[in-house]
Amino acid sequence: MAEPEPDGSPVAPATGRRIAALAFPALGVLAAEPIYLLFDIAVVGRLGALPLAGLAIGGLILSTLSSQMTFLSYGTTARSARFFGAGNRTSAVGEGVQATWLALGLGMLIVVVVEAAAVPLVSALAAGGDIATTALPWVRIAIVGVPAILVSAAGNGWMRGVQDTGRPLRYVVAGFAVSAVLCPLLVYGWLGMPRLELVGSAVANLLGQWVAALLFLRSLLAERVPLWVQPEVLRAQVVMGRDLVLRTMAFQACFVSAGAVAARFGAAAVAAHQVVLQLWNFLALVLDSLAIAAQSLVGAALGAGQLAHAKSVAWRVTIFSTLASAVLAGVFAVGASVFPSVFTDDRSVLDAIGVPWWFMVAQLPVAGIVFALDGVLLGAGDAKFMRNATLISALVGFLPLVWLSLAFGWGLLGIWSGLSTFMVLRLAFVGWRAFSGHWLVPGTG
């Protein structure tokens, strides 16, 4: 029997079925973009090395900017879920309204700044020359999609908060489907379309992103909640966003440093590092879907004032995530002699890939716990602690070992030791926080 909320309506128990119902659509949303990007790369790649290099530079700019704004999704989920748990759907959706205004404002600001600075920015990243010339038109067009990307992030946030992960999946898939259809037509000039080559990729991306954003906006309008700007709510969202942005920057500093140092050890080392890192990132998305379920359920339980229920959700999601990560670790341990050859047949890369591969396998069970508890604490709105824990883990664990690897020639062993230390430190921090109960703060404040 579910515990009653203040208005008498029940909070759904955190059964395995309920967690899966939230997690699987969330996984679809998380996986849709990487899958489409692979398709985009395959289409553009047939134009040759130069357009592909231009896409890489443009994609780096767009993904870096977008990843810094993930607080529009995660922060909104935490705040919206508390109101939803308290039985106040209007305020829960209202958080989405304010996040959407913030998304539009930040998005337009980013467009103006990047359009003004596009030439020096692209030239700096591409070191000038033909690559910069090729990338520039893509950047100028694709950047206009940033407001749409951020609106979709805000839409994902409030919908997760009201425990609706089905519609976001449909909207995101619809947007990427439009892009996937248009991309080859515009790149190659098929079916009477103009042959735009690399620019066609940017146009296809832009149109698909705005299709998804308009679907999210339509759903927001259908809720018939007040649409005016509420400065006090925006201020609270910006404060939480600041903490989450700093946390994201710590992640990016670590992985950029790791890639830069790996490159110093030769092509085989950096290729092996990149293969395993991309696989690690994909597995992190799989586990992150459970963390999203935790955010929604924990936030709702705390909003309803049901602390015991929030603790139950935390334990159950952590157990599921740990089991899933252990199974994944087992699969990749058993397949260690086979799976790497799926990604490359280069003997030097295969010889180097063993070190990061076994680090990845060993880290997976730790990651299962860490990512689940990340979701619990983010659902509780404990962003300041998450920021501090990530910054300390990066500055004490990951970055020193990465740069010591360069100084002492430790290679991939040192780099991946840094990542493992980073994960263990995060486990210590979030584990302590979870057991302490400091995150169990009831209400909607």
Which residues does each PLM region occupy?
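Small-residue hotspots at the loop-to-helix junctions and early N-terminal turns
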Residues: 49-60, 136-139, 202, 267-282, ...
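Small-residue-rich hydrophobic transmembrane alpha-helices
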Residues: 52-112, 151-168, 272-336, 370-381, ...
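Short alpha-helical transmembrane segments in multi-pass integral membrane proteins
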Residues: 1-25, 80-147, 178-185, 193-244, ...
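Transmembrane helical elements of multi-pass membrane transporters/channels
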Residues: 21-40, 141, 145, 152, ...
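Alpha-helical transmembrane segments of multipass membrane proteins
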Residues: 38-42, 120, 154-158, 181-188, ...
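Helix-terminus/linker motif at the lipid-water interface of multi-pass membrane proteins
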Residues: 31-53, 122-129, 185-196, 249-282, ...
